Protein backbone atom coordinates (compact mmCIF):
# COMPACT_ATOMS: atom_id res chain seq x y z
CA UNK A 1 0.00 0.00 0.00
CA UNK A 2 1.49 3.32 -1.07
CA UNK A 3 0.12 5.71 1.53
CA UNK A 4 1.08 8.85 3.40
CA UNK A 5 2.59 6.72 6.22
CA UNK A 6 6.07 6.98 4.72
CA UNK A 7 6.04 10.75 5.42
CA UNK A 8 5.33 10.36 9.15
CA UNK A 9 7.40 10.16 12.30
CA UNK A 10 7.49 6.90 14.23
CA UNK A 11 4.97 8.19 16.79
CA UNK A 12 2.62 9.45 14.06
CA UNK A 13 2.82 6.10 12.24
CA UNK A 14 2.02 4.21 15.43
CA UNK A 15 -1.01 6.39 16.16
CA UNK A 16 -2.35 6.32 12.59
CA UNK A 17 -1.88 2.54 12.47
CA UNK A 18 -3.74 2.24 15.77
CA UNK A 19 -6.58 4.33 14.30
CA UNK A 20 -6.61 2.14 11.16
CA UNK A 21 -6.82 -0.99 13.29
CA UNK A 22 -9.68 0.42 15.37
CA UNK A 23 -11.67 1.41 12.28
CA UNK A 24 -11.74 -2.13 10.86
CA UNK A 25 -12.18 -3.78 14.27
CA UNK A 26 -15.08 -1.60 15.39
CA UNK A 27 -16.79 -1.34 12.00
CA UNK A 28 -16.32 -4.77 10.45
CA UNK A 29 -18.44 -3.76 7.43
CA UNK A 30 -15.70 -1.53 6.00
CA UNK A 31 -12.85 -2.46 3.70
CA UNK A 32 -9.65 -0.43 3.67
CA UNK A 33 -7.88 0.72 0.53
CA UNK A 34 -5.53 3.53 -0.44
CA UNK A 35 -7.10 6.27 -2.53
CA UNK A 36 -7.74 9.97 -2.80
CA UNK A 37 -10.03 12.07 -0.64
CA UNK A 38 -10.80 15.39 -2.29
CA UNK A 39 -7.36 16.90 -3.06
CA UNK A 40 -5.45 14.60 -0.66
CA UNK A 41 -3.55 11.73 -2.27
CA UNK A 42 -2.61 8.29 -0.90
CA UNK A 43 -5.16 8.36 1.92
CA UNK A 44 -6.71 5.46 3.77
CA UNK A 45 -10.24 5.06 2.44
CA UNK A 46 -12.86 2.88 4.12
CA UNK A 47 -15.87 1.76 2.14
CA UNK A 48 -19.07 -0.02 3.15
CA UNK A 49 -20.63 -1.89 0.21
CA UNK A 50 -18.45 0.17 -2.12
CA UNK A 51 -19.60 3.50 -0.62
CA UNK A 52 -17.13 5.86 1.09
CA UNK A 53 -17.70 5.81 4.85
CA UNK A 54 -14.46 6.96 6.52
CA UNK A 55 -11.06 8.25 5.54
CA UNK A 56 -7.73 9.15 7.10
CA UNK A 57 -5.62 11.74 5.34
CA UNK A 58 -2.63 14.00 5.87
CA UNK A 59 -2.24 17.44 4.38
CA UNK A 60 0.63 19.87 4.74
CA UNK A 61 -0.99 21.41 7.82
CA UNK A 62 -3.01 18.70 9.54
CA UNK A 63 -4.41 15.19 9.72
CA UNK A 64 -8.09 14.57 8.91
CA UNK A 65 -10.54 11.87 9.82
CA UNK A 66 -13.38 12.00 7.30
CA UNK A 67 -16.74 10.51 8.22
CA UNK A 68 -19.88 10.20 6.13
CA UNK A 69 -21.60 9.05 9.32
CA UNK A 70 -20.75 12.33 10.99
CA UNK A 71 -21.94 14.13 7.85
CA UNK A 72 -25.25 12.26 7.69
CA UNK A 73 -26.11 11.77 11.38
CA UNK A 74 -26.63 14.85 13.57
CA UNK A 75 -26.23 12.92 16.84
CA UNK A 76 -22.81 11.59 15.82
CA UNK A 77 -21.75 15.08 14.76
CA UNK A 78 -23.05 16.52 18.04
CA UNK A 79 -21.08 13.94 20.06
CA UNK A 80 -17.73 14.86 18.54
CA UNK A 81 -18.42 18.60 18.77
CA UNK A 82 -19.34 18.34 22.45
CA UNK A 83 -16.41 16.07 23.36
CA UNK A 84 -13.54 17.70 21.53
CA UNK A 85 -11.43 20.62 22.60
CA UNK A 86 -8.32 20.53 20.40
CA UNK A 87 -10.03 19.37 17.21
CA UNK A 88 -11.27 21.45 14.33
CA UNK A 89 -14.67 20.05 13.46
CA UNK A 90 -16.28 20.50 10.07
CA UNK A 91 -19.50 19.01 8.69
CA UNK A 92 -17.92 15.71 7.68
CA UNK A 93 -14.40 15.68 9.05
CA UNK A 94 -12.27 16.16 12.12
CA UNK A 95 -8.98 17.98 11.59
CA UNK A 96 -6.13 17.72 14.07
CA UNK A 97 -2.73 19.38 13.89
CA UNK A 98 -0.91 16.44 15.47
CA UNK A 99 -1.83 12.94 16.58
CA UNK A 100 -1.90 13.91 20.26
CA UNK A 101 -4.82 16.28 19.63
CA UNK A 102 -7.26 13.44 18.85
CA UNK A 103 -7.03 11.14 21.90
CA UNK A 104 -7.31 7.49 20.92
CA UNK A 105 -10.00 6.87 23.58
CA UNK A 106 -12.17 9.63 22.09
CA UNK A 107 -11.53 8.26 18.58
CA UNK A 108 -12.58 4.78 19.72
CA UNK A 109 -15.76 6.07 21.37
CA UNK A 110 -16.56 8.16 18.29
CA UNK A 111 -16.17 5.09 16.05
CA UNK A 112 -18.28 2.95 18.36
CA UNK A 113 -21.12 5.48 18.21
CA UNK A 114 -20.65 5.89 14.45
CA UNK A 115 -20.78 2.15 13.81
CA UNK A 116 -24.19 1.94 15.50
CA UNK A 117 -25.66 4.67 13.28
CA UNK A 118 -27.75 3.53 10.32
CA UNK A 119 -25.60 4.01 7.22
CA UNK A 120 -28.01 2.21 4.85
CA UNK A 121 -29.72 5.41 3.59
CA UNK A 122 -26.34 6.72 2.42
CA UNK A 123 -25.44 3.40 0.79
CA UNK A 124 -28.83 3.27 -0.96
CA UNK A 125 -28.50 6.87 -2.13
CA UNK A 126 -25.13 6.25 -3.78
CA UNK A 127 -26.15 2.88 -5.23
CA UNK A 128 -29.14 4.53 -6.94
CA UNK A 129 -26.79 7.11 -8.48
CA UNK A 130 -24.62 4.42 -10.13
Per-region residue spans from a language model:
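Charge-dense, helix-prone N-terminal extensions
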Residues: 1-130
Amino acid sequence: MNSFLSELSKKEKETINQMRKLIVEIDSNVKEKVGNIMSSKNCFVYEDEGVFKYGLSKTKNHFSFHSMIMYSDQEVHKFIVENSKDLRIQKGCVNFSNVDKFPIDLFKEFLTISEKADFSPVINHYKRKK
